[in-house]
């Protein structure tokens, strides 16, 4: 597991202790480095982004482009861009927890791990989410649709 970012000092200290105990299983990096973030997003199966406040968020979109499935708290831009995966309906692009509790976050992670065991379905979802388009062309069309509805 790779952890990038900073937050509550008490938690950082606990994570540092875990890293010392399990150096081959955990890497804790209490800073933010854009290049390293992209390396993580490109080289992992899942990307946990448990932000309590995220007005936009780009990392979840980068993760999708790299084929890494995001696990996010439903807030701000994360709520706008990530929808719960539904294998039967072939919809969604990540795993979402709606209450900011450790229990709900663990449930979302468990749903991701359940998908991880379904290799064929996971591959299909990865291919699908890598094609998602968050470009300004799409956003512009969505805004124009809204303005058109307002004016009519």
What would you call each of these model-derived segments?
Residues 29-32, 124-126, 142-143:
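Short coil/turn segments at secondary-structure boundaries
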Residues 1-37:
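Nucleotide-activated donor-binding/catalytic signature segment of Leloir-type glycosyltransferases, i.e.
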Residues 136-152:
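C-terminal alpha-helical cap of glycosyltransferases
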Residues 18, 112-115, 150:
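Hydrophobic helix-cap positions at the C-terminus of alpha-helices
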Residues 34, 39-126, 130-131:
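Catalytic binding pocket for nucleotide-activated donors in carbohydrate/polymer assembly enzymes
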Residues 24, 68, 134:
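Short glycine/serine/threonine/alanine-rich loop segments
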Residues 18-21, 62-65, 148:
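Short, surface-exposed basic-aromatic patches at helix termini and helix-loop junctions that form
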